[in-house]
């Protein structure tokens, strides 16, 4: 039977752990709130950028760049599905929803699909199931840089321009 001192020590340790856990939750909630605010603040810029690019694309001669040309899908054409997930499981249902959306698109797609995987959880899920993968990017979320996004985009663009894919689909929850 533990002594009274041992019991008090254990109670104090549990209280300290609760205090640390509460502080960690508050920090995580603060980071999440800031990230959500940044996303909401970026929406007007993203929608305006989409309008500008759509306007430019309709006024420019499609022959000047291969991404502007409309292609008829070939019978053997594939679709590139880019699935974005986290590297850890500490993001609620984000990973699950993103993986489900990507898997559902692959199942419903009449064309053959190939994957571009961003994040460890997506790589692990689709890798275990033997899906065809064009590229993987893991570990980029610790310090997200423009260069990481540029590499992903350039890989997808190069494959599309080479004629490997007729269309592309991004999946993120």
Where in this protein do the model-derived segments appear?
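Conserved loop-to-helix interface motifs that mediate assembly, gating, or partner/ligand docking
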Residues: 2-173
């Amino acid at each position: 039977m533990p002594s009274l001192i041992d019991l008090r020590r254990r109670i104090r340790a549990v209280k300290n752990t609760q205090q640390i856990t509460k502080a960690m939750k508050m920090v995580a909630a603060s980071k999440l709130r800031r990230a959500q605010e940044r996303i909401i603040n970026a929406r007007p810029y993203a929608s305006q950028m989409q309008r500008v690019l759509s306007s430019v694309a309709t006024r420019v001669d499609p022959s000047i760049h291969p991404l502007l040309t409309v292609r008829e899908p070939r019978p053997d054409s594939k679709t590139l599905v880019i699935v974005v997930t986290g590297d850890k499981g500490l993001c609620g249902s984000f990973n699950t929803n993103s993986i489900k959306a990507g898997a559902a698109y692959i199942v419903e797609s009449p064309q053959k699909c190939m994957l571009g995987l961003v994040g460890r959880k997506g790589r692990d899920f689709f890798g275990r199931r033997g899906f065809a993968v064009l590229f993987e990017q893991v570990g980029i979320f610790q310090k997200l840089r423009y260069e990481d996004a540029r590499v992903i985009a350039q890989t997808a663009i190069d494959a599309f321009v080479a004629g490997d894919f007729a269309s592309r689909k991004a999946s993120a929850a």
